[in-house]
Amino acid sequence: MQIVKSFVYRRYTLDEVKRKIVDVLQGASTGLSGIELADRTDINRMTITKYLDVLHAMGLVKKKKTGNVNVWFLETGIADIEFPINYVQVQQKLISAILAGEEELARRILLSVLNSDIDQVRVLTDVVLPAVNTVGELYSRGRLDKTERSFLLNLMMEIIDLVKFNVRVSEQKANAHTLAVAGSDDKVHVAKSAAVAFSALGWDSLYIGDVEDQIDPFFDIDLQRYISRMWGSKHGLMVVCIFSSGEGSLRFLSSTAKAMKGRLRGELRIAAIATPELQAAAEENSDHVAKDLLSLVQWAERQYSITK
């Protein structure tokens, strides 16, 4: 009698396969072939080969040709990242890579995290922005010169872009719109991070950039015209998020945005992140003043749940 074995091929997520491969390669200093990885992970060879190519393209694994066989290794900096994700550990590794000027390592660390089952907003609030703050603190203490500071801050903008282009939106929110604008150069990273965070949460999100040098007696008209063009035909909740360390630009931008209330089809809210010194100025024209990005996002999410 012939016995027929039936095989059920399960579908794996990238995160599942990546974890299995990382776990196995961590203990294989001399590397493993695709066949060995398939055996040790209990994933069929065709599937493991496909995912190894994906992880190689992402910069998480590397291969070395030995005869006719590809031997696979973990890329530098990936082997000792803990799963589930330890955000403090990743933050420290990212800061170390950035301060050492190791751009590729910094990107690999972020990519490894972003392609895991993680809270994408926390990657920004608990990993990326603390790294930006560290650069600022080191510069304030005289431990970085102007050129190095510029290089590192530019690298951090690229890191934020890396998060942006790897965002996975589980569900797009209906009638949820945000616009982030910076009123000073030192707030561009948190402003852009806000736009990326809202995008990750399913909002229709815009980032204008730093407009401090654009502010003049007629810029309010220019900004209001832009908001009308982008949101004029839309409905729902509209949140203008303002980030500035300058009292003048903070007042100007918040009052300009507030003047748009009643002129749009949706419900307009003004939010700002401000230090205690600027709290009073921020409160004049804002519906909410947050202490950090996470509290701002949480407030906006609550507003959306109320108005939708």
PLM features: what roles do these ranges have?
Residues G142, I159-K308:
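C-terminal regulatory/effector modules of DNA-binding transcriptional regulators
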Residues I21-V22, A38-D39, I81, A180-G183:
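Short, contiguous strand/loop micro-motifs
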Residues F7, V24, D42-N44:
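C-terminal, charge/polar-rich interaction regions
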Residues M1-V22, P84-I85:
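Short alpha-helical segments that sit at the start of domains
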Residues I43-R45, T49-R168:
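Long amphipathic alpha-helical segments
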Residues V24-L25, L52:
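Hydrophobic structural patches
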Residues A28-R40:
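Short acidic, hydrophobic short linear motifs in intrinsically disordered regions
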